[in-house]
Structure formats: structure tokens, C-alpha cells
Regions:
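Amphipathic alpha-helix face/heptad-repeat signature
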Residues: 30-34, 62, 69-76, 115-125, ...
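Short, hydrophobic/aliphatic alpha-helical segments
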Residues: 3-21
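Preference for long, well-ordered alpha-helical segments
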Residues: 129-132, 144-204, 210
């Protein structure tokens, strides 16, 4: 089943259920995609307006980037579900003999690595989404500036949620050096892009209250 083909109602019903997927990872990817789509909407509301003719080409380039990024995040909704399957299978492997224990440890290590790769990819995409939101807030139509602020907040939430999904998997890794490297990669993205998202929000909020 391709989760991205479900209706909103069906997706949320599955999310609310005990079904293994979607979970927090897929939901984060969807929220990030919604954030990017909001930014793209700001761009579409800006193009073709005489007032913004000077930034028309820049906005069109942002829109092209946003469309590609949204599709990437949509694909990561399903990718997160796909990554959970081998992880669940690994936990179910027998470990009665030393050979079985060794095999389970190896399979689990590989599955945990795969389960970290998807949220790290979602994080990377959300960082791009926050950069786009910043550009849309700066250059886009003032009539849609609130949506640029929402875009930044959506991508920020998805970024933080995905960091939690990295952490829950690295915590279970026996290779602590590898786990630390993945945690550091996530931490660097948080350190750089959470302040940018907050900056976009504060800028938009200040403009709306002026």
C-alpha cells in the first residue's frame, strides 16, 4: 500500500490506529511536505504580479525547487514505512543459539541503520524547506506572508520530530561510535536550522503586528 495515495481521512485513521505504519516518521515527512507546499503557494500568489516583477525569476526558481522538494518529502512518507518492515522482522528473529544471536545482531544493526537513514533524509529536506520559507517570506507577496511563516513552522516541527526518530533508533545501536556520528549529524541540522525557522516566524509575526 502506498500511503501517499490514501485520502486524508484514511491516512489519519491509520495514523491513529495500532497499524505499524504510518507512524511519527511518516507523519513528519507529510508535515514537512505541507510546509513546503505552503511556501510554494506563496510563490504562486506572487508570480504574475506587477508589484513583484523584479523578483519574478527568483520566485519561479524557488517554486521549481519547492515542487521537487515536496515530492521528495511525499516519497519519504512511504520510505519511512518501508524502513520499519525490516526492523520489525529483525526483532522477531530467534536468538536461542550463538549463531542465531550473531545473525540477529547483524540484521538488527543493518535495520537500525536503515531506520535512521530515512528520518535523517527527512531532516535534510526540512532544512531546505526552512531555507525556502525564509526566501518566500523575504521576497513573496505580503498578502501571503503569514503562509511563509506557517511554512517555516511546519518544517521546523517536522525537523524536530525526525530528530526524535533518529534518536530512538541510535539509542538501540550497539556500535556507539556510529550512533554518536548519526546523532551529531542530526544535532548539527537542529543547531543551524531551528534558529532560522524561529527567525522567519519572528519576522513574519512582527510584520503582521506592525
Amino acid at each position: 500500500m502506498d500511503l501517499t495515495q490514501l485520502s486524508c481521512e484514511d491516512f489519519l485513521s491509520r495514523l491513529a490506529s495500532k497499524a505499524p505504519a504510518p507512524g511519527g516518521g511518516g507523519a513528519a515527512a507529510l508535515v514537512g511536505a505541507a510546509g513546503v507546499a505552503l511556501g510554494n503557494m506563496v510563490g504562486d500568489l506572487t508570480t504574475g504580479k506587477k508589484k513583484y516583477a523584479a523578483v519574478e525569476e527568483e520566485i519561479l526558481a524557488l517554486n521549481a525547487h519547492a515542487e521537487t522538494l515536496r515530492k521528495r518529502l511525499e516519497a519519504l512518507v512511504q520510505a519511512d514505512a518501508d524502513a520499519f518492515t525490516p526492523l520489525a522482522a529483525a526483532y522477531g528473529l530467534p536468538r536461542e543459539t550463538p549463531e542465531q544471536q550473531a545473525r540477529k545482531a547483524a540484521v538488527l544493526a543493518e535495520a537500525l541503520d536503515g531506520a535512521c537513514a530515512v528520518p535523517l533524509d527527512i531532516m535534510d529536506a526540512c532544512c531546505e524547506g526552512i531555507r525556502l520559507a525564509s526566501d518566500y517570506a523575504e521576497k513573496g507577496s505580503v498578502l501571503a506572508v503569514s503562509d511563509a511563516g506557517c511554512a517555516a513552522l511546519f518544517c521546523k516541527a517536522a525537523l524536530q520530530a525526525s530528530a526524535l526518530n533518529v534518536a530512538i533508533n541510535t539509542k538501540l545501536m550497539t556500535d556507539r561510535a556510529h550512533a554518536a556520528a548519526l546523532d551529531e549529524k542530526a544535532a548539527r541540522m537542529l543547531a543551524e536550522y531551528l534558529p532560522l525557522a524561529d527567525e522567519v516566524y519572528q519576522s513574519v509575526a512582527s510584520r503582521l503586528r506592525a
